[in-house]
A protein has these predicted regions:
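A non-catalytic, amphipathic alpha-helix used as a structural packing/dimerization or gating element
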Residues: 34, 55, 62-80, 150, ...
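Cytosolic Rossmann-like ligand/nucleotide-binding regulatory domains
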Residues: 123-124
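Conserved core segment of the aminotransferase class I/II
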Residues: 6-8, 15-64
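PLP-dependent enzyme catalytic core of the Aspartate aminotransferase-like
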Residues: 115-118, 127-164
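Conserved PLP-binding catalytic core of the aspartate aminotransferase-like
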Residues: 68-77, 82-117, 127, 131-132, ...
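Phosphate/diphosphate-binding loops
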Residues: 3
Length: 164
């Protein structure tokens, strides 16, 4: 660990699983086990989740073309959404917002997208600040450009009836 006392990470993003980890000295880990409030509701990863996480790590290490395709998709969608005037914030991951800033509209837009067989999550208060409601877009390496373009086209159409 060197000069860093603690490293935390999640398996729910790039690994596509659940759970997370803490890497630290044995002494700090013991302290966290006994005194971290969040540990009360924690449980060990199931064997299935552990196997999935290990397989995801293997794919990340041995299949760089998957990561390359992911970032090609992410960059394409970011560019297209920005060209169409959508506020996508400043996230640097494959999961990023499309800012709506209205709780009611977020759910209306998500429903309209779902009718078009496009799934995005609506995120509202208290998960984000008031007036920071957003759609959460998760770009995958398995998406094709045509699918990303369908999202952009749908959002442009929906914005005509639900301005955001």
């Amino acid at each position: 660990l060197g000069q860093v006392d603690i490293i935390t990470g999640t398996f729910s993003k790039s690994f596509g699983c659940v759970g997370g980890f803490v890497a630290a000295s044995e002494k700090l880990i013991q302290y966290l086990r006994y005194y971290a409030d969040s540990n009360v509701f924690s449980a060990a990863m199931t064997p299935q989740v552990t196997a999935s996480s290990l397989k995801a790590l293997e794919l990340i290490q041995t299949r760089p073309e998957i990561r390359k395709k992911l970032w090609t998709n992410v960059n394409y969608l970011r560019k297209r959404l920005t060209e169409e005037g959508f506020d996508i914030g400043c996230s640097v991951s494959a999961i990023f917002p499309i800012m709506v800033r209205d709780n009611r509209k977020v759910y209306e837009i998500a429903r309209e997208l779902q009718k078009r067989c496009i799934f995005v999550s609506g995120i509202t208060y208290p998960a984000v600040r008031t007036k920071e409601a957003r759609l959460r877009v998760s770009v995958l390496a398995s998406h094709e450009i045509v699918q990303l373009e369908q999202l952009v086209t749908a959002l442009v159409e929906i914005r005509k009836s639900i301005p955001f």
